[in-house]
Design a protein with these regions (language model features):
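Rieske [2Fe-2S] iron-sulfur-binding domain
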Residues: 82-173
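Early exported N-terminus immediately downstream of N-terminal targeting peptides
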Residues: 63-78
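Conserved C-terminal region and hinge/linker of Rieske [2Fe-2S] proteins, especially
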Residues: 12, 32, 39-43, 160-162, ...
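N-terminal secretory signal peptides and thylakoid transit peptides that target proteins
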Residues: 2-21
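C-terminal segment of N-terminal export signals and the immediately downstream linker at the start
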Residues: 16, 26-67
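Short, positively charged
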Residues: 5, 40-44, 121
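Short beta-strand or tight-loop elements
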Residues: 47-49, 69, 97, 158
Length: 173
């Protein structure tokens, strides 16, 4: 290798190294500015949403966002509650009583994350073989209590932490 080739290689190396160090430096300066725009982790962990349920008729449901995920709120009819409670636990892939999925004394209200437990798709309401929810992505069927009845989903739809603030308001989170 001639002396001139060594200079060219050394020059190329210094050029590349300088740009690399510069890019890392710019990234180190810009990252804190971008990161400070994210919500505070403590606030995000404690986030709550209050929902007015006074206008929801029996048999109807609404969807709200909480922590970036859909939450299904359904005001079930007496027939839907009876149907959910008549299911034998042996018939369920993930056995759970309907009574354990609702608040005592507020059996008509079902509150659950609107995310299929298989791969995270959003199920369609009032669809499927069990008059509950149907996941169009891979065919999971949930009943009127959000319990998996058929399909690849391994578990029932999740019930988030929630409470009734009063007769017209639910606080999720």
């Amino acid at each position: 290798m001639s002396k001139e080739e060594k200079k060219v290689n050394r020059r190329d190396f210094l050029f590349t190294a300088s740009y690399t160090v510069g890019a890392v430096g710019v990234g180190a300066v810009i990252w804190p500015m971008i990161d400070q725009m994210n919500p505070d982790k403590a606030q995000q962990a404690l986030a709550t949403t209050e929902v007015d349920i006074s206008n929801i008729e029996p048999g109807k449901s609404i969807t709200v966002l909480w922590r970036g995920k859909p939450v299904f709120l359904k005001r079930r009819t007496d027939e839907e509650i009876a149907e959910a409670r008549a299911v034998k636990l042996d018939d369920l892939p993930d056995p759970q009583k309907d009574e354990d999925r609702v608040k005592t004394g507020k059996d008509e209200w079902l509150v659950m994350l609107g995310v299929c437990t298989h791969l995270g798709c959003v199920p369609l309401k009032d669809k499927g073989d069990f008059n509950g929810w149907f996941c169009p992505c891979h065919g999971s069927h949930y009943d009127v209590s959000g319990r998996i009845r058929k399909g690849p989903a391994p578990t029932n739809m999740e019930i988030p932490k929630f409470e009734f603030v009063d007769n017209n308001t639910i606080k999720i989170g």
